[in-house]
Amino acid sequence: MNEKPVLGIQDIQNLLPHRYPFLLVDKILSYDLNTRSVVAQKNVTINEPFFAGHFPGAPIMPGVLILEALAQAAGVLLGIILENDRDKKIALFLGIQKAKFRQPVKPGDVLTLKAEFSLISAKGGKAFAQAFVGSQVVAEGELSFVLVKKESI
């Protein structure tokens, strides 16, 4: 599944502070401000730095990085929503509840990252997020974010 993005890597870098090797979203396939949802994609390649040690001979993407990719996808949507305050505020990943890892993610997989916010306020937000490889859910959880002034970090 190599769909045309609505936001490419340059747009994502304008919305997120992350950079290689920690930028874990390659493109945004869709977003909807009414449903407060986003669909993103991460192409998982054997060249990812974490595969050198996780695990030699049987590489799998660390689950915590799948959750981080989900948080970054949700963070892109928060960046779009923050439009007028983007230069002043930043969303920080605050926590995860009910995280589940269902399948391993391997080199060559395409991760589809989906998040839908149940709450967005001036202080932060909460989203349910799922990562897929094809139609299989590989990870999911409830993500929490806090909005802080950029100058405070």
UniProtKB/Swiss-Prot annotation:
One GO CC term on file: cytoplasm
Source species of the chain: Chlamydia trachomatis serovar D (strain ATCC VR-885 / DSM 19411 / UW-3/Cx)
GO molecular function terms noted in the UniProt entry: (3R)-hydroxyacyl-[acyl-carrier-protein] dehydratase activity
Enzyme class name: lyase
Full protein name: 3-hydroxyacyl-[acyl-carrier-protein] dehydratase FabZ
EC number(s) per entry: 4.2.1.59
InterPro entries, per database record: FabA_FabZ (IPR013114), FabZ (IPR010084), HotDog_dom_sf (IPR029069)
Subcellular location: Cytoplasm
PANTHER family assigned to the protein according to its UniProt record, in alphabetical order: 3-HYDROXYACYL-[ACYL-CARRIER-PROTEIN] DEHYDRATASE
Family that this chain belongs to: Belongs to the thioester dehydratase family. FabZ subfamily.
Xref: Pfam families: FabA
Main localisation: cytoplasm
Function, in words: Involved in unsaturated fatty acids biosynthesis. Catalyzes the dehydration of short chain beta-hydroxyacyl-ACPs and long chain saturated and unsaturated beta-hydroxyacyl-ACPs.
Entry annotation: catalytic residues: H54
Any single biological process term in GO: lipid A biosynthetic process
Lineage: Bacteria, Pseudomonadati, Chlamydiota, Chlamydiia, Chlamydiales
Alphabetical list of HAMAP family matching this protein: FabZ (MF_00406)
Assigned keywords, A-Z: Cytoplasm, Lipid A biosynthesis, Lipid biosynthesis, Lipid metabolism, Lyase
Catalysed conversion reaction: a (3R)-hydroxyacyl-[ACP] = a (2E)-enoyl-[ACP] + H2O
